[in-house]
């Protein structure tokens, strides 16, 4: 692992556009390898997770950064992310023969569009926070803060995440109470289940029975009366920042920040039924310095060719020079696959 990480330091890769939109722009991204623990570079096990490589991503393009949600393709060849400025980011992923993440091969930026086919503008309209593939794999659901909403963006080519660029969205009907949430405390995480249920977690909503407010509702033909409220109890003092589903398992990413202790994160595992019943999630790993961590905001899970669970986590640098855009890869358990 150590040698693999060292050999990919500061990969500067020319990127090519993969999306259908004329506004999709190829960008250059620098990928610098980062150890799981800078104080112990040989460390690879964190709780129930095994480190499979990580990168710090930077670009000269001012619109690159602020990654707040992520989907990794089933074959792990591509990654689609959304940003706080309302952009799609599509990147090709590079791994070695052992599956260790080495870098990126391509990268492109394209504006997320409104229902009127115009690029989203300003924090109120463009603050994308969560993203999920629909259960049938034909569209991307994206959640926004500011003007709280969930938009459905059809894929130009089902199976090709990057083909969402240039898509004209439709707006899903919001559950009752969503618009009462603070501008910066709305939907922070979402995922779809195999049966077409959309699971939503807020950042600052409070459930009647305690915990962070969430909803379960149909992902299509959404009606406020069909939304089932539930409360999610993250470990104190964390708040949920993203959800990812793999088969019947839900992975919940959570974050905490304080001036005194800095930033930290928790990854937990649960199911839709457990969420509905108010059962506590199972903690898999805790990201606390000196472990590599930043403003953890996006998680995606895929099944490898050999059947292992691979988990990808991205951080949101808020377009701040003192924060980082991290892309970290893990496998569940202690397998080297």
Label each region the model flagged.
Residues 6-14:
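Bacterial N-terminal signal peptides
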Residues 1-4:
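Positively charged n-region of N-terminal signal peptides that target proteins for export
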Residues 16-337:
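Sequence/structural signature of beta-propeller domains
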């Amino acid at each position: 692992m150590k040698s693999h990480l060292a050999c990919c330091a500061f990969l500067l890769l020319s990127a090519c556009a993969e999306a259908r939109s004329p506004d999709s722009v190829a960008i250059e991204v620098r990928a610098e390898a980062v150890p799981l623990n800078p104080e112990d570079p040989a460390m690879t096990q964190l709780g129930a997770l095994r480190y499979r490589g990580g990168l710090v991503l930077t670009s000269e393009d001012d619109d690159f950064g602020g990654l707040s949600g992520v989907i990794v393709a089933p074959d792990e060849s591509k990654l689609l992310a959304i940003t706080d400025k309302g952009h799609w980011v599509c990147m090709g992923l590079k791994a070695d023969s052992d599956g260790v993440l080495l870098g990126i091969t391509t990268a492109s930026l394209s504006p997320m569009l409104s229902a009127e086919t115009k690029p989203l503008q300003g924090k109120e309209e463009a603050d994308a926070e969560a993203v999920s593939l629909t259960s049938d794999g034909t569209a991307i659901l994206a959640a926004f803060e500011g003007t709280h909403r969930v938009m459905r963006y059809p894929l130009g080519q089902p199976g090709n995440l990057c083909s969402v660029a240039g898509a004209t969205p439709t707006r899903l009907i919001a559950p009752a109470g969503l618009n009462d949430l603070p501008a910066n405390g709305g939907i922070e995480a979402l995922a779809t289940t195999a049966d077409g249920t959309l699971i939503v977690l807020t950042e600052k909503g409070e459930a009647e029975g305690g915990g962070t407010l969430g909803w379960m509702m149909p992902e299509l033909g959404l009606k406020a009366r069909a939304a089932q409220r539930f409360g999610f109890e993250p470990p104190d003092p964390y708040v949920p920042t993203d959800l990812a589903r793999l088969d019947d398992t839900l992975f919940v990413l959570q974050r905490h920040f304080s001036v005194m202790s800095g930033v930290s994160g928790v990854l937990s595992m649960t199911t839709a039924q457990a969420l509905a019943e108010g059962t506590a999630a199972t903690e898999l790993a805790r990201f606390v310095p000196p472990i590599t961590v930043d403003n953890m905001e996006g998680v995606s899970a895929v099944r490898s060719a050999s059947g292992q669970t691979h988990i990808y986590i991205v951080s949101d640098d808020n377009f701040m020079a003192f924060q980082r855009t991290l892309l970290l890869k893990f496998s569940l358990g202690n397998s080297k696959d």
